[in-house]
């Protein structure tokens, strides 16, 4: 399991609520944009796993126009995430998302979450 990078000077958002496709607002009215959504698939015997990783960045203002960095398809993302523990968020769809990174570089605060969904063949 990968180590979680957490910036202790910036608290994790407790709630992230979708205000538009790929745009979330936390409990302090800070805006977070899903700048990248990665999906990968792997098989283990009769089991197929899908891993979805989402990279969210804190923005001080909403973009007026979609940027090239914004993902085209956010259908796999819940409409709300709630922080359940130090490294786990629960989606409104009942999914559990693992916190991979919470860090800041310059003015950019990043939050990276992932989920692994297993299905039997």
From Swiss-Prot:
It comes from the Eukaryota. Pfam families: TCL1_MTCP1. Belongs to the TCL1 family. GO terms for molecular function: protein serine/threonine kinase activator activity. It comes from Mus musculus. This is Protein TCL1B5. InterPro entries: TCL1_MTCP1, TCL1_MTCP1_sf.
